[in-house]
Amino acid sequence: MTKTTYPGTAYRPILSEQEADRFTLPHYFTRRGHDGHSDTDVWQPTSIEVDPATPWVVGPQVGVDGATHGTVQQAVNAALRAQQDRPCIDIKLLPGIYTGAVYIPADAPPLTLFGTGEQPNDVVIQLALDSMFSPATYRETVNSHGEYQPGDPAWYMYDLCASKQNATIDTICAAVVWSQSDNLQMKNLTVVNALLDSVDGRAHQAVALRTDGDKIQLERVRLIGRQDTFFVNTSNLRNEYVTDRYSRAYIKDSYIEGDVDYVFGRATAVFDRVHFHTVSSRGAKDIHVFAPDSMPWAQYGFLAVSCRFTGDEGFSGGRKAKLGRAWDQGARQTGYQPNKTANGQLVIRDSTIDASYDREQPWGVAATTARPFAGNVDSARNLDDVQFNRLWEYNNIDEV
């Protein structure tokens, strides 16, 4: 085992102890305005508590073991219609496999989905969705039995995608579970985009979970997919990316699997004791774990602390995965523009990284623009210098 040490190299920059002091959970969870001071909002997430006596229970068979609904979306709809100013909603998921999309609208109160199995994989929400689907295929896949109807709480979300006039639905409509609400919590369950290896290694964005709201918490959750597994994002009601604010998320004691950019988005997200497992089975190129698109004025993007990074046997030889790359979202026509284009921010610290990853050059060229990675190793460096990437490590161990 080898420990990474300051200052590293221009291809693999390492933070000093003093620099690393800034990259802690409280800093990531404190939201500030553009000037760094106004509109300060401090979030202090605690362990997820659930109500086992909740009236909304999802099970494989309605009427058995207290199940009131056969699908997760049915339970979400019923709970939102009957909330009657409840401060929060808990939805219990009995062990089973639930096939179908789950959409949670922006105006939902704090909502918790929790599995009652002994392990997170005892409760599975799954569907095969592909960004390359046509709108017609999307409608057939997501709404073949009228799961979404006008007047339903999340109808607008479905309709934004079902009514698209493009040839394909794109990444923004390819999520199995999609929440636009603040204060979403998920505990002890698994979400799978079941497209997996049924497609080739080209671009097939297939999101398991997408979150747009603020103060998102995942605990003992498994997210499984290939490209774009977890979209931890910030957007508006029209399903558009926004650049004037960001959301926060806390992912703890969880497992995330994928191949290309499989943790990505504009939110400020902390991954605490998360196992990231990179797979080669689809034959994809440009394999990266992270692809943040933090705005240049946002000091904090993604933080992975006390995490594990592993890969499958496809990386045991000369082929290696990358830890991540910046996503220069929105700059395909202009190229990277300092202080305008997103400049993804990420710190991986106090974590273990196995031999599946490129030790010499763990960061790839930016998505969208192919901007070459530029690490700042100057002794007087500004960690937010827009002329450089903001992808860092601290106190990690390279496993043999």
Curated annotation (Swiss-Prot):
InterPro entries assigned to the protein according to its UniProt record, in alphabetical order: Pectin_lyas_fold (IPR012334), Pectin_lyase_fold/virulence (IPR011050), Pectinest_B (IPR054974), Pectinesterase_Asp_AS (IPR033131), Pectinesterase_cat (IPR000070)
Q: Which domain of life is it from?
A: Bacteria
A GO cellular component term found in this entry reads:
cell outer membrane
What pathway annotation does it carry? Answer: Glycan metabolism; pectin degradation; 2-dehydro-3-deoxy-D-gluconate from pectin: step 1/5
Q: Which GO terms describe its biological process?
A: cell wall modification; pectin catabolic process
Where does this protein hold substrate?
171, 205, 325, 327
EC class, as a word, reads hydrolase
Q: Which GO terms describe its molecular function?
A: pectinesterase activity
- Catalytic site positions: 228 (proton donor), 261 (nucleophile)
Q: What is its EC number?
A: 3.1.1.11
> Pfam families this protein is in?
Pectinesterase
The alphabetized UniProt keywords are:
Aspartyl esterase, Hydrolase
UniProt site (Transition state stabilizer): 227
Q: Which reaction does it catalyse?
A: [(1->4)-alpha-D-galacturonosyl methyl ester](n) + n H2O = [(1->4)-alpha-D-galacturonosyl](n) + n methanol + n H(+)
What family name appears in the similarity comment?
A: Belongs to the pectinesterase family.
Q: What is this protein called?
A: Pectinesterase B
List the source organism: Pectobacterium parmentieri
- Gene symbol? pemB
